[in-house]
């Protein structure tokens, strides 16, 4: 099996091709899908743009690529600002020239990417954005009674692991950086997520406040962020409980990979891999290999296709519409960068 992730030059090559494939200079932004369909807005939803920011951060985290990656940051910043709604101090789902909604989960993903960019660039405007988003979610999206976080601003009809998990992780990372954030909401969000685990130990999707039922759908990213959050908390407050929670989730995580294969959801899988990269610095390879091997296998196959075409790197995706989604391509680049970090 080839191991393209071992060479950092492959990582930057994949990043540059992804960037060039989706970029739009006027107005500045990135396409949601290439080629665009008749009913597709030309510019990406912030979910997909957030995936691109996360891919940038993962690539920039590789020391040998830092200077070269920095060349792309000013343009990314310009696009980033086009989603910002100053009235709410949060990011809308589309650039402000179009009517868009505010989703709490998408804001948390953008804030997490912003924090990672801050760590590498030292530019305070990125951590300032992360703090604005965290305060906004605690004020408008966090339910202190349950510890859950709503999915979207309107209607507030469901509490989602995909909102509570990344928000808990965001709070933990801000605390780790020395920001003044209270611990209680972080712990409550983690506890709420833990109530959403099924009998196998993986995390179910959301609780519907209208029907009072739990949606039992399982996605890899919903296990990734609670796992990541407790590992960060274990570094801040070395309590045995946090470490035990992390190891318990890792022991349950193979249930996400039926037949030892990843689901065809590249972005969801990249979120889980962020947590596994963190775990690779804490726990044994013996524990993690069954989880990491499917990523390596899929990447090896996808890299062969990448090298034989002029298309972006794209891992197996269940997307059935024509063209390539930005978030699928961006998360494939992020996966390559994370595998490089794990191997280093």
PLM regions and their residue ranges:
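Active-site cradle of extracellular carbohydrate-active enzymes
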Residues: 164-167, 171, 182-230
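Oxyanion-binding "anion nests"
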Residues: 218-256
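CBM-like carbohydrate-recognition segments
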Residues: 3-105, 159, 241-248, 252-344
């Amino acid at each position: 099996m080839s191991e393209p992730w071992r060479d950092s030059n492959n990582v930057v090559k994949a990043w540059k091709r992804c960037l060039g494939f989706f970029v739009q200079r006027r107005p500045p932004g990135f396409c949601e899908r290439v080629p665009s369909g008749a009913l597709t807005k030309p510019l990406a939803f912030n979910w997909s743009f957030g995936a691109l920011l996360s891919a940038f951060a993962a690539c920039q985290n590789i020391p040998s690529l830092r200077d070269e990656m920095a060349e792309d940051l000013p343009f990314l910043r310009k696009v980033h600002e086009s989603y910002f709604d100053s009235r709410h101090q949060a990011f809308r789902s589309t650039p402000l020239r179009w009517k868009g909604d505010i989703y709490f989960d998408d804001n948390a993903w953008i804030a997490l990417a912003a924090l990672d960019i801050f760590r590498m660039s030292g530019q305070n405007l990125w951590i300032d954005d992360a703090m604005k988003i965290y305060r906004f979610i605690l004020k408008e999206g966090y339910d202190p009674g349950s510890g859950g976080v709503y999915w979207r601003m309107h209607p507030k009809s469901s509490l989602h692991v995909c909102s509570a998990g990344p928000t808990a992780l965001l709070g933990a990372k801000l605390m780790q950086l020395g920001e003044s954030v209270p611990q209680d909401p972080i712990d409550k969000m983690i506890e709420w997520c833990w109530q959403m685990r099924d009998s196998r130990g993986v995390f179910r999707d959301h609780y519907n406040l209208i029907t009072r039922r739990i949606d039992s759908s399982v996605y890899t990213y919903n296990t990734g962020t609670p796992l990541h959050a407790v590992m960060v908390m274990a570094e801040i407050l070395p309590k045995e409980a946090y470490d035990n929670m992390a190891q318990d989730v890792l022991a349950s995580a193979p249930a996400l990979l039926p037949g030892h294969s990843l689901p065809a959801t590249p972005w969801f899988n990249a979120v889980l891999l962020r947590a596994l990269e963190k775990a690779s610095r804490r726990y044994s390879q013996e524990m993690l290999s069954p989880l990491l091997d499917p990523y390596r296998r899929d990447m090896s196959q996808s890299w062969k296709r990448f090298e034989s075409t002029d298309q972006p790197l794209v891992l197996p995706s269940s997307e059935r519409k024509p063209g390539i989604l930005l978030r699928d391509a961006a998360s494939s680049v992020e996966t390559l960068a994370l595998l490089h970090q794990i191997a280093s």
